[in-house]
């Protein structure tokens, strides 16, 4: 399947998953859509898909739950490394986060931290193979 068709398929799946309130599937669909446009080399479509993905993240209740649990850790430990906070967060009780039995994965934590940085809720500064995390101000 050509990358542009692949991207559109993932975009449609993402939109449908969000309508069904399956936010994890929607996130994966948007991510795969963006990656497909990136691989296809279509910058105009990539930009549109990226904007739609970012808009989804702002609506994603899982993102909000994740970041609301991660922000206090960052505030209490300015400069904590992303790899260290991911280890701490993986051991936290996230039972209410998903409506199905799935533990929070490192990718979930990185998703929340990446977009929190992109949206200005935290700062992420490259430090070795990880990122140093701080709250703004």
Describe each region flagged by the PLM.
Residues 16-17, 36, 43, 56:
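Residue position in alpha-helical solenoids
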Residues 79-100:
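Short acidic, hydrophobic short linear motifs in intrinsically disordered regions
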Residues 126-137:
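Short, cationic-aromatic polyanion-contact patches
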Residues 47-79:
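Short alpha-helical segments that sit at the start of domains
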Residues 100-118:
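Short amphipathic alpha-helical interaction segments
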Residues 117-126:
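A short, conserved structural fragment
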